[in-house]
């Protein structure tokens, strides 16, 4: 259903099958005879294999509704051509590079996110249309995206659930604001978001926090902030 981006299950007429076979001529079969020439096949998890400068990083995938997402944040210290990204200690205006928290989460400045040199082939930084499709499919429930341990913003505030039933694996890595990151970790999660022209960073970024079960937005603050990148396949 392209209107609400959902799938409807229709009962089949065939018996349940536990095996799929690939024949020597390339045909796919659900059953074989002794005379068939069957190829040995190694089934692998659906992953993105990102190779940069001799370093291989595998990103598992998740399908949510009609969308395909990486199931973890981008973790690259090199551009796709192998050139090194500058490693930074703080965010300042017009700077390009990446930052790492003490727990080794990766954050990128706006100039890197817009460079066109950081993402694996066929993968994109989501725009608000992409996020809204995801949000509508999950009926706005942030808990379905949240994973890991979320801590309260204030002592008296309640932490909302993190069920990760979608498989998105949204860990509260926080963000960098200037030189500060630790205060935001385990409480916040934000991702760089393009505007709907896909040519520039939107004024708002995708955002979740521990005390609400709502998928929100936050000011991008491109001169002072660095966020994680979560990729979508288009």
Where are these regions (language model features)?
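Surface-exposed interfaces of beta-sheet-rich extracellular modules
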Residues: 1-20, 192
């Amino acid at each position: 259903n392209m209107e609400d981006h959902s799938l409807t299950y229709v009962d089949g007429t065939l018996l349940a099958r536990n095996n799929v076979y690939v024949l020597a001529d390339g045909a796919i079969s659900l059953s074989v005879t002794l005379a068939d020439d069957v190829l040995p096949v190694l089934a692998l998890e659906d992953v993105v294999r990102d190779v940069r400068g001799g370093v291989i990083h595998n990103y598992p995938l998740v399908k949510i509704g009609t969308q395909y997402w990486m199931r973890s944040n981008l973790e690259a210290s090199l551009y796709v051509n192998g050139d090194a990204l500058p490693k930074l200690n703080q965010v300042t205006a017009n700077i390009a590079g990446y930052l790492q928290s003490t727990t080794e989460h990766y954050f990128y400045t706006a100039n890197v996110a817009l460079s066109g040199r950081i993402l694996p082939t066929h993968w994109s930084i989501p725009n608000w249309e992409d996020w809204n499709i995801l949000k509508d499919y999950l009926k706005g429930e942030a808990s379905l995206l949240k994973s890991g341990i979320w801590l309260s913003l204030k002592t008296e505030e309640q932490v909302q659930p993190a069920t990760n039933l979608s498989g998105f694996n949204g860990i509260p890595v926080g963000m960098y604001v200037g030189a500060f990151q630790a205060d935001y970790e385990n409480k916040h999660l934000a991702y760089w978001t393009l505007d709907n022209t896909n040519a520039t960073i939107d004024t708002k970024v995708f955002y979740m926090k521990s005390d609400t079960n709502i998928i929100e937005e936050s000011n991008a603050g491109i001169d002072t902030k660095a966020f994680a990148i979560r990729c979508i396949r288009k």
